[in-house]
Swiss-Prot record:
It comes from Tupiella akineta (Green alga). This is Cytochrome b6-f complex subunit 6. GO terms for biological process: photosynthesis. It is a single-pass membrane protein. The keyword Membrane applies. One of its GO terms (molecular function) is electron transporter, transferring electrons within cytochrome b6/f complex of photosystem II activity. It is found in: Plastid, Chloroplast thylakoid membrane. Belongs to the PetL family. The keyword Thylakoid applies. Signal peptide: none annotated. Keywords: Chloroplast, Electron transport, Membrane, Photosynthesis, Plastid, Thylakoid, Transmembrane, Transmembrane helix, Transport.
Amino acid sequence: MVTLISYISLLAGFVIIASVFYLALVKIKLI
């Protein structure tokens, strides 16, 4: 149970980092 929660939180953090990096890349391309 604890490992599942930690895995989900890790996956969520990875998704957030990936989305932020994607938005930054799009802004660089627009400029």
